[in-house]
């Protein structure tokens, strides 16, 4: 390992039974922290490092949003915004490596939405109050119209 960057070779399958050699570049958090300007901007999302410098002017939320998260772990902010599947797919083109395993903090719970079941009941937070309000409205109309007819 030289400096704050390391490369590891790994082999895997391409899904067609062929062995494929893949190379992962590891970055230390100190290295990522240096990349926090308009000239070079790196983000860490779920242990993966992304060079989003080319995306600064295109980001729908503006470059300020990216600059606030530059050089640090932006996983929580990324998930809080609720990025679309298209945005997650687009992120792949900016991938440059992973955070070095010794710099990863152990996660108590996964923030990956594909593994997170809490949002499956998110609709209940909105639909139940709406149904309740509609029912109250009907009851109010029923009782006020009944009192007028008697």
Curated annotation (Swiss-Prot):
Species this protein is from: Homo sapiens
Annotated TM spans: 123-140
Classification via InterPro entries: Cyt_B5-like_heme/steroid-bd, Cyt_B5-like_heme/steroid_sf, Cyt_B5_heme-BS, Cytochrome_b5
Function: Cytochrome b5 is a membrane-bound hemoprotein functioning as an electron carrier for several membrane-bound oxygenases.
GO biological process, one term: nitric oxide biosynthetic process
Residue(s) carrying N6-methyllysine: 39
Top-level taxonomy: Eukaryota, Metazoa, Chordata, Craniata, Vertebrata
Binding site for heme: 59, 83
Protein's name according to its UniProt entry: Cytochrome b5 type B
Entry keyword set: Acetylation, Electron transport, Heme, Iron, Membrane, Metal-binding, Methylation, Mitochondrion, Mitochondrion outer membrane, Phosphoprotein, Transmembrane, Transmembrane helix, Transport
PTM annotation (N6-acetyllysine): residues: 34
Record-linked PANTHER family: CYTOCHROME B5, CYTOCHROME B5 TYPE B
Compartmental location: Mitochondrion outer membrane
Region Disordered, residue ranges: 1-20
GO cellular component, one term: nitric-oxide synthase complex
Domain Cytochrome b5 heme-binding: 24-100
Gene from which the chain derives: CYB5B
UniProt similarity note: Belongs to the cytochrome b5 family.
Domain of life, source organism: Eukaryota
Phosphoserine: residues carrying this PTM: 23, 37, 84
Gene3D superfamilies: Cytochrome b5-like heme/steroid binding domain (3.10.120.10)
A GO MF label: metal ion binding
Quaternary structure note: Component of a complex composed of cytochrome b5, NADH-cytochrome b5 reductase (CYB5R3) and MTARC2.
Residue stretch(es) of the prosequence: 1-15
């Amino acid at each position: 390992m030289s400096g704050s960057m390391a490369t590891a070779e790994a082999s895997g399958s391409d899904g067609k039974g062929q062995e494929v050699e893949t190379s992962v570049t590891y970055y230390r958090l100190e290295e990522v922290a240096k990349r926090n300007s308009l000239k070079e901007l790196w983000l860490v999302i779920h242990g993966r490092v992304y060079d989003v410098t080319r995306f600064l002017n295109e980001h729908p939320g503006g470059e300020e949003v990216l600059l606030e998260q530059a050089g640090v772990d932006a996983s929580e902010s990324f998930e809080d915004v609720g990025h679309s599947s298209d945005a997650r797919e687009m992120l792949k083109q900016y991938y440059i490596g992973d955070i070095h395993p010794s710099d990863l903090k152990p996660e108590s719970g996964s923030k990956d939405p594909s593994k997170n079941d809490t949002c499956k009941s998110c609709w209940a937070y909105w639909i139940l109050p709406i149904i309740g309000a509609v029912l109250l409205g009907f009851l109010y109309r029923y009782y006020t119209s009944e009192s007028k007819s008697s």
